């Protein structure tokens, strides 16, 4: 019984006894059939025949020479042998010796393979020659040159080795990255298609399923059958693609075609192809033949990867390649190599190998070819030795293939992620042409290479100007942390905002601690990303220090305390995200991330010590909220805090600070798209609770300050001194506000008055802040303006320019604002004191905040300065600029009669008309993005309703309308409870007010447009806190109020309403009875809150009415039924 032949790699041991050859008793003896057996096993044979193929051994075993080529591979000492004397003569003996020497030299290339035989063949077995070359070389080494059959085999092995050498040289001259694309292009050029390993296999099996029983189907029916079966698993399957697969089988002659007159032909599968193995082999053979026709030389391992997606079909593909080889294919390959050398210039002088290759190509490979002569044998083996030496020399010294693989292509993410197929299956179908890393070493190597790359183009023109004007953008980056720009190609920047995939990911902390909370890392969405399917990228890898194109703040953050205080050591770095960065894909408009900060009360004053100030916290970009359970229309609700980088930053990473402040608007606002509706659980809690409540951290987006670069050069001056509110004195408010009425006692009235005075003093101090000494920001082109302030619907096409330049409103400085207020007040109702002035410190602070808001809002334009009179060009509130004309409303002063005995205070409508324009009480064409800040006593609830109204001109959904109606009902119920506490007189006063409000509500109102201008107030947090203190004061002084004062207050409200009837456009104010408690008593600090409360609180009611009116239903009855709305602080 024949012995099973061993694997070709086990050529150093006897296939019978499996013992390694040696020079003593187990000398390797090669037979004429190509098998090599040790001398001991050969002597034990019962008959002189090969134990594997039973080939007769014609020569005496004792006369067969030892295979010295194998002995040198096992490291044995080659014994001196008696020179073999051939019967044909001495000349033939010389030829034999020369041929034997050639084989021994070629066998040395198998030395790395032999050294690894004990541990198995793995990646550490590095050899200059490829595996096909090694395999053919092993065949040559096993040939017995003494026997005639051995010489025939040696000549065929030499020819095969030479042909493979030509193929290797051609492979060295072709681009492996383009190999697969060229192959499939050649396949498609012939009307065929390969759908991928998995899909192609399924398609072939379905074809076999339809035709294996010998049935004849038309092409159309066959294609439809396959497509219908493939669709559940492969939705991309189409009739066209499957038709191309059938065409591939048709070219392979797998069908027996029956033609029919005036009808489609019927196809029947040939009997020899009615098994999957036979059909697949013919299918693969057709693809290999197409590649050969196209002049492509593809290795068997590459074929296995391309057609099967693994490395287990190399021998299958090799057999197909060998079967398709013809005697003419060798000469054709030599011609192709000549053409390739002409194209490259032949730097290695490979043309010298051409005569040897032609000699090998002329060898007859047929089995019945005559045996070669000794001279032909010598010439053939010398030629193959020269050719193989030339290949090895080219690979070692002139090959560009290895260097090409070291250089990543133009795509910056080349091999920076692990290959998914390699991780999951252990093999990659793309082989060397795969653009993903196949090992951790390769991954780290290319990531390091990419870190040294500089972005190929700046993020925007404005960022280039940062460097042109010499601003210190690069020195801001610390040595310890940098931005990973290498793995991300900077895309084009529409409208100056970095689009999805932007290279900028994080601004660098100034400190030495590049800490980064893991919860701040953006989540990578695989279905939106074009990166590798493997591990997600680390967006915060270190990057070069020379990144000057980052949109960083060129101005250092000023100290956060008074200038006379000693500076505190900064122990926490400032982490910011530049404006232009996109941590999230552009399509990710409906996913919001959770605020990483801990839970904290929303408005509880932090227990800071007086005289201390705190380090700014790291600011992160756009933390979006969890997906809503019940979506609401309109933009998401946003917390309103000052956008100033210097103003409202409280370090949220200190464990000792329980208070967190939500941001004013999304820090990373992308103005090019409309944000989806959100379900505001916290807003519903606001509506249900009449008292301020704390906000859970999950609903509080992280605060992000506004980048200063976004402003024009005219805004070079902004406060460098800290806001007084940052020095937060201790305010002993023990019980924090909660969602339910707190059982703990409230602060005393004296404490509330004292705290109010402190806040008023801090608001007053803001007036004297001097401009900073550093240089102004550079003039940025309009394309880089952050577009939060523009209509989102217009931003996509860039149509907001018309709104910017077509209208003008001189509302950007203190001079013009007061001038307009004075001019408007003169022809209208005159105040009791006869002059328009701000009698209250709080009113001044509010006015300054509003002016600061307007200045910041309109400075997104790049118009020239327009001086007015002899006033300074740039006021302390910034430069005069242009914005929409409709921002100015000539509604006249809104005046209320002050209580008797209280200081007279006038309130100009210009002080509040900005809110009408911004919030939707007038004909403003702009829509705020739900981030209108509070002014004075403007409360968060007010802005929530404004956010609801600001639906960008889109009708509110039914859920929003029901929510608004429910809110009004709840507020009316709370109002009725509050009014019952005041007694019969308060009830009667409320009825009088109700009748008056109903009369006003019956008047026609101007058409409402959605508000579109978001406001920003730097002192907003102080205003909120002041509002809380005043609410407490109102509650404490409610029992002490005088009945006659209540009457006076009611008269003042009626007088205000009458002003609107006397020719003034009614500002749609509805007075909220619950907040009348704030005005029923004298307020400390020499002012009464009656007038402001009437106007401010009534604006909330009008915003609610606008929210319902914007539906188109005009349902105002709910809000007009009582004329009051709850004043719950957010």
Swiss-Prot record:
Zinc fingers (C3H1-type) at which residues? 413-441
Site residues (Cleavage), renumbered to this chain: 510, 579
Which residues are noted in the entry as Zn(2+) 1-binding?
Answer: 14, 17, 38
Q: What class of enzyme is it?
A: transferase
**Other remarks on record?**
Treatment of C57BL/6 males with ethylnitrosourea led to the identification of the sanroque mouse strain. Homozygous sanroque mice develop high titers of autoantibodies and display excessive numbers of follicular helper T-cells and germinal centers with pattern of pathology consistent with lupus. Sanroque mice reproducibly develop intestinal inflammation in the small intestine but not the colon.
Name the residue ranges with Polar residues bias. Answer: 497-506, 1116-1130
Q: What is known of its domains?
A: The ROQ region is required for CDE RNA-binding. Has 2 separate RNA-binding sites, one for CDE RNA and the other for dsRNA, both sites are important for mRNA decay. ADE RNA-binding involves an extended binding surface on the ROQ region with a number of additional residues compared with the CDE RNA. It may also be involved in localization to stress granules. The RING-type zinc finger may be required for proper localization to stress granules, but not to P-bodies.
The reported effect of residue 265 to Y is: Decreases CDE and ADE RNA-binding
Q: What is this protein called?
A: Roquin-1
| Stretch list, region Disordered | 493-567, 722-750, 1100-1130
**What's the encoding gene here?**
Rc3h1
Q: Which organism is it from?
A: Mus musculus (Mouse)
Give the pathway listed in the UniProt entry for this protein.
Protein modification; protein ubiquitination
Amino acid composition bias (Pro residues), ranges on this chain: 553-567, 732-746
Summarizing the annotation, the consequence of altering residue 199 to R is:
In sanroque; partial loss of ICOS regulation, no effect on localization to stress granules, no effect on RNA-binding
PANTHER family annotated for this entry?
A: RING FINGER AND CCCH-TYPE ZINC FINGER DOMAIN-CONTAINING PROTEIN (PTHR13139), ROQUIN-1 (PTHR13139:SF6)
Q: Where is this region: ROQ?
A: 177-326
Ranges where the record places region HEPN-N: 128-176
């Amino acid at each position: 019984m024949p012995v099973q032949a061993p694997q070709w790699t086990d050529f150093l041991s006897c296939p019978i006894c499996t013992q390694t050859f040696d020079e003593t008793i187990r000398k390797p003896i090669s037979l004429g059939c190509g098998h090599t057996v040790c001398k001991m096993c050969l002597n034990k044979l019962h008959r002189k025949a090969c134990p594997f193929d039973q080939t007769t051994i014609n020569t005496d075993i004792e006369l067969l020479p030892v295979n010295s080529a194998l002995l040198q591979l096992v490291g044995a000492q080659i014994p001196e042998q008696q020179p073999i004397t051939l019967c044909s003569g001495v000349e033939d003996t010389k030829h034999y010796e020369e041929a034997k020497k050639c084989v021994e030299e070629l066998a040395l290339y198998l030395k790395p393979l032999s050294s690894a035989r004990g541990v198995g063949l793995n990646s550490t077995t590095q050899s200059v020659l490829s595996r096909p070359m090694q395999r053919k070389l092993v065949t040559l080494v096993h040939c017995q040159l003494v026997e005639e059959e051995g010489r025939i085999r040696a000549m065929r092995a030499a020819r095969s080795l030479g042909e493979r050498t030509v193929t290797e040289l051609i492979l060295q001259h072709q681009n492996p990255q383009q190999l697969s694309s060229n192959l499939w292009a050649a396949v498609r050029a012939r009307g065929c298609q390969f759908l991928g390993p998995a899909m192609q296999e399924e398609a072939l099996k379905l074809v076999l399923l339809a035709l294996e029983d010998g049935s004849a189907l038309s092409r159309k029916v066959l294609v439809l059958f396959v497509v219908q079966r493939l669709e559940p698993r492969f939705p991309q399957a189409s009739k066209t693609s499957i038709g191309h697969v059938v065409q591939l089988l048709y070219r392979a002659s797998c069908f027996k075609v029956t033609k029919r007159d005036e009808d489609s032909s019927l196809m029947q599968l040939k009997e020899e192809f009615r098994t999957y193995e036979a059909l697949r082999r013919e299918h693969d053979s057709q693809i290999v033949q197409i590649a050969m026709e196209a002049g492509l030389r593809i290795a068997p391992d590459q074929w296995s990867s391309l057609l099967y997606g693994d490395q287990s079909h190399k021998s299958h593909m090799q057999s197909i390649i060998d079967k398709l080889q013809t005697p003419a294919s060798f000469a054709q390959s030599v011609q192709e190599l000549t053409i390739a050398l002409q194209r490259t210039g032949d730097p290695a002088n490979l043309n010298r190998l051409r005569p040897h290759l032609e000699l090998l190509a002329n060898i007859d490979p047929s089995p019945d070819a005559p045996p070669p002569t000794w001279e032909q044998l010598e010439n053939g083996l010398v030629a193959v030795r020269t050719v193989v030496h030339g290949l090895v020399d080219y690979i070692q010294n002139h090959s560009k293939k290895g260097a090409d693989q070291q250089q990543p292509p133009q795509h910056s993410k080349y091999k920076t992620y692990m290959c998914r197929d390699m991780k999951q299956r252990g093999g990659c179908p793309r082989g060397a042409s795969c653009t993903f890393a196949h090992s951790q070493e390769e991954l780290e190597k290319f990531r390091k290479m990419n870190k040294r790359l500089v972005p190929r183009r700046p993020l925007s023109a404005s960022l280039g100007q940062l460097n042109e004007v010499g601003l210190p953008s690069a020195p801001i980056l610390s040595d310890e942390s940098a931005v990973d720009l290498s793995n991300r190609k900077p895309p084009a920047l529409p409208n100056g905002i970095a689009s999805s995939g932007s290279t900028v990911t994080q601004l660098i902390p100034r400190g030495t601690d590049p800490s980064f909370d893991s919860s701040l890392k953006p989540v990578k969405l695989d279905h939106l990303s074009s990166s590798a399917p493997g591990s997600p990228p680390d967006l915060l890898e270190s990057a070069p220090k020379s990144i000057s194109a980052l949109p960083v703040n060129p101005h250092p953050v000023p100290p956060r305390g008074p200038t006379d205080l000693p500076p505190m050591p900064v122990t926490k770095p400032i982490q910011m995200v530049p404006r232009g960065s996109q941590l999230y894909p552009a399509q990710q408009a409906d996913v919001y991330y959770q605020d990483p900060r801990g839970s904290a009360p929303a408005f509880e004053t932090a227990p800071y010590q007086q005289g201390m100030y705190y380090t700014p916290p790291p600011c992160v970009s756009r933390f979006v909220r969890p997906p809503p359970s019940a979506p609401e229309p309109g933009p998401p609700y946003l917390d309103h805090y000052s956008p100033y980088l210097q103003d409202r930053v409280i370090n949220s990473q200190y464990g000792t600070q329980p208070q967190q402040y939500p941001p004013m608007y999304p820090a990373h606002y992308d103005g090019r798209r409309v944000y989806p509706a959100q379900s505001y659980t916290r807003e519903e809690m606001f509506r249900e609770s009449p008292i301020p409540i704390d906000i859970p951290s999950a609903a509080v987006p992280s605060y992000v300050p506004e980048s200063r670069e976004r402003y024009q050069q005219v805004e070079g001056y902004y406060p460098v001194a800290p806001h007084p509110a940052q020095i937060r004195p201790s305010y002993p408010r023990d019980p924090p506000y909660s969602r339910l009425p707190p059982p703990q006692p409230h602060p005393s009235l004296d404490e509330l008055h004292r705290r109010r005075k402190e806040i008023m003093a801090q608001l007053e101090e803001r007036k004297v802040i001097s401009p900073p000494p550093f240089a102004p920001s550079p003039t940025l082109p309009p394309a880089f303006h952050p577009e939060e302030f523009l209509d989102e619907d217009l931003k996509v096409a860039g149509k907001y320019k018309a709104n910017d330049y077509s209208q003008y409103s001189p509302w950007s400085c203190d001079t013009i604002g007061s001038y307009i207020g004075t001019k408007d007040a003169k022809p209208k109702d005159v105040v009791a004191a006869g002059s328009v002035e701000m009698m209250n410190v709080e009113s001044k602070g509010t006015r300054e905040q509003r002016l600061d808001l307007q200045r910041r809002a309109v400075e997104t334009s790049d118009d020239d300065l327009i001086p007015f009179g002899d006033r300074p060009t740039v006021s302390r509130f910034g430069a005069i600029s242009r914005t929409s004309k409709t921002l100015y409303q000539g509604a006249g002063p809104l005046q209320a009669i002050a209580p008797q005995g209280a200081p007279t205070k006038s309130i100009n409508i210009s002080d509040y008309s900005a809110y009408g324009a911004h919030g939707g009480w007038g004909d403003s064409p702009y829509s705020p993005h739900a981030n209108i800040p509070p002014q004075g006593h403007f409360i968060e609830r007010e802005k929530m309703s404004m956010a609801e109204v600001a639906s960008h001109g889109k009708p509110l959904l039914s859920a929003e309308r029901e929510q608004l109606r429910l809110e009004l009902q709840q507020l009316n119920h709370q109002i009725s409870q509050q009014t019952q506490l005041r007694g019969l007189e308060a009830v009667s006063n409320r009825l009088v007010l109700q009748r008056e409000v109903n009369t006003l509500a019956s008047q026609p109102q101007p058409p409402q447009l959605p508000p579109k201008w978001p406001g920003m107030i730097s002192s907003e947090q102080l205003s909120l806190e002041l509002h809380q203190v005043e609410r407490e004061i109102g509650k404490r002084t409610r029992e002490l109020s005088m009945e006659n004062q209540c009457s006076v207050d009611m008269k003042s409200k009626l007088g205000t309403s009458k002003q609107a009837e006397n020719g003034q456009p009614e500002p749609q104010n509805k007075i909220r009875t619950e907040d009348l408690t704030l005005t029923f008593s004298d307020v400390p600090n020499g002012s009464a809150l009656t007038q402001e409360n009437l106007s401010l609180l009534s604006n909330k009611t009008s915003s609610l009415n606008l929210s319902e009116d914007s539906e188109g239903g005009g349902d105002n009855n709910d809000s007009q039924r009582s004329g009051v709305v709850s004043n719950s602080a957010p």
